[in-house]
Amino acid sequence: MIRSELLSYERPGRERQRVQLVRWDDWASLRFLRPGVGADALRETAQIYRRFLIPAAPWVFGQLLLFALPEGGEAELRAAAETLRRGLRLRGGEPRFSDKKTRALWETLSRAGCVELVRGRLPFLRVLPVRSSTGLLSESEPDARLRVNASFFIFDPFDCATRYDTVGTPFGLAVEDGEVLSPPLCGREALFVYRDGRVRVETPTLEDLTVRIGDKAFRPGRDGAVYARPGYRKTPRGRGFDHVIVGRTLVDVVRGGGCPVPASGFVLRLAEQTGEPGGAVAYGGMEGLLFGVQAGNSLVRGGAPTEGFVSRFWNVREPWRTPFPPSLYPLDYEKARAARIALGADAAGKPLLLWAEGAAKIGHRPGEDSCGASLSEFAAICRDVGMVEGVNLDGGGSAQILLDGKRALQISDRRDDGSEQERAVPLGLMVK
């Protein structure tokens, strides 16, 4: 049985905050949801850039070419991005090509409606490939009683740090019934639900896993060196073969080091090449978990609200200074307000899900609409409703809860007419 209630909190300056609290009885019913291919994912992503991201910080962005493929997989998408980066320039907003291959690709994409150009103030071009395997939660798994967005995913130019990163790639640990769907990254906290009923916030690492490539299994850090962000932008030069892994795919093998470290994955250096690019990767080591999801920061641990950043984030104002993990964050734990999603457990170990409604990015009415919550404010709310262990999931414009197909609150991204503009996401959670 799923139970929902709406709560309201008064804030200084006559602001208010609305929160949806959802409870149900068992973790076994919680599953990951993959929205699948969304026909409008490219267009909707470009609209988010045009309406919200670039107007908020136009001095950060140059010209952005977002594109998808009408057909083909991840390898083909990355190859197309490399072709466009090498052979395409924009002059006066018009494309110029250095070779016939690039021109042919551009014409194919243009005819299929798979190109979107958005403009910031800086004089450079960034090519951003967009995965087609993203979609709208509202159009996915319509029979599910509960749907909510989940972990972070690659979304902006800083996230697309290497040729291996594509917009719409989910990242961070995801475990379902002992199976690792994606590995842990970036030293961020995760919510672990053990088969024996324990629920805890922990910080998993790649060294906790075994990595299987083909028929061989390796322990990162013992059988081979592991390189990930924010520790490394490139692997050091040296002997061996760098195996570039994103999710459950071996995307490249580079000999001798100097390999870019993806924001959405990691590099495992082995003495010999194992497997071929495009091959499958599997993980072991989490068989004792019923469920696990990594995003961070924690909100409540041991019944006490978290008082500052524990998970590793990077300040959006200076992303170029060091190798940075994805999901750049405004590092003000106390004051930076936004829409938030929390997942955790009460004292009996039963699930709690909260959505703090964000301020509308267009047409916000102070005192009438929600103002959004800082992580500090949200942690206090989570503790007050009885959460004893819990983490923050992806928030902002992605934040929403659908219960029996309906939203009790509103998404913070809005169109000019005030209607909600839902973001396409690659991963969610559901209870059927």
Language-model features: locations:
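Gly/Ser/Thr/Pro-rich low-complexity, intrinsically disordered segments
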Residues: 1-432
